[in-house]
């Protein structure tokens, strides 16, 4: 198997998207397509998977030790990028993107490359609607917030039902797994789960398909190599929306 090396890059800009989310822009562009991810090496800490939000950027939510270490870095510091890895979104025909929270990161690239006709963006509150101004310039954007501070007062799933999902050829989805599971349920009800393309997040050790830590029950498909994007009909009978696994392989309820 051809091993993709980790490439050192310099952080050229850090954009605070919200109190807990930052975009790290780096000195090199990678041939990433929407949905591709990379393994990010944080010196002295760990190597973690992150989706590309641009061909020279990742957008990160601070959730643990590794991301906390990343947030401690400054412009001019170096990190390692191994990628692009995995498969990506492969939209055909009329395409809708549905994003929740930091799940907007890989779908941002889809929109900026002109591959999304319509976009549904959700967050808890207005200040957490990632890239909303940029997305409004390149696609037909509708927003939903849990607290009603911007756009629809409610969830992206409510906007999805109103959008007639069966009328789209492709529906690209990324966000909290509970949200994505609800989107899949809507597509099942509409009789078109195969139109959904879902970007999954699983614990990864290697990112290149060797260790098996990111395999999906019961198919054995590897999120890092066979994914991270899967169609709804492929994951419909998996653990998707029920549980993930931690570093030791133990189940963690969603």
Identify the function of each model-found stretch.
Residues 1-77:
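Ferredoxin-reductase
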Residues 46-54, 86-94, 224:
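Short, Lys/Arg- and Gly-enriched loop/turn segments at beta-strand edges
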Residues 68-203:
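FNR/FR-type flavoprotein reductase catalytic core
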Residues 106, 177-178, 200-229:
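Local cysteine-cluster metal-coordination motifs and their immediate loop/turn environment
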Residues 221-226, 230-254:
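Short Fe-S-cluster ligation motifs
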